[in-house]
Amino acid sequence: MHRSIDYYFSLVSPSAYIGHATFMNLTQRHSLDVNFKPVSLPTIFAETGGLPLNKRAPARQRYRIMELQRWREKRGVRLNVHPKFWPFNVEAADHLTVAIVESGANPNQFLRKAFPGVWADERNLADEQTLVMLADGVGLPAQKLLADAKSESVKKRYEKNIKEALEVDAFGSPCYVLNGEVFWGQDRIELLDDALTSGRKAYRNDICSSWEYFAIRCIHPDLQSA
């Protein structure tokens, strides 16, 4: 029986792009079925304390540029750290990805064109004709999918993805969720690989030692609501 993994991401995310090919190769090696779940990062950030790039401290913004260059080299991807059409309204692109999933098709080939479209090829993914071209280019029925992407059912699926992400504490892009354990960021792919190779049980985020339990319950009961 195939194992599966939930993949929360957005096409606006450089980290999702940088890790996408490596992640997909990993899923092939481990025979994992991938549940592709595009999400709205502004909504996720608002609910989990994350900040959009322009709200972060300048030092953090500068460090991000260094990290993009490091990981560009590490993963061997083409990436412009200041792409022409970024940031952009990603809703149409993410909704199209949802529509592909809902149609029963695998969105991987589309994503392999769309991600570098933003970060390497200076394409505007907020433009519907660009999306049609990319989808057509990988053999998908682009016009039908574009119409489906505007449907109420796709909108509800997108909202459900967001709800599910929040329920499992997937608070950024990309997040890979294996048996309930969240691996946040493409720089955790090697840790995900280790978990899959070892076959260990999923780590939990609600376990504390007996001493920690005693300290919270008896010494600092005010921390129970923290």
What residues fall within each predicted segment?
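Generic structural motif recognizing short loop/turn segments at the entrances and edges of beta-strands
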Residues: M1-R3, V77
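Structural alpha/beta surface segment adjacent to cysteine/selenocysteine redox centers
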Residues: L11, Y17-V118, Y203, I207-F214, ...
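C-terminal cap of thioredoxin/glutaredoxin-like
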Residues: R3-D6, V12-L32, E102-A105, Q109, ...
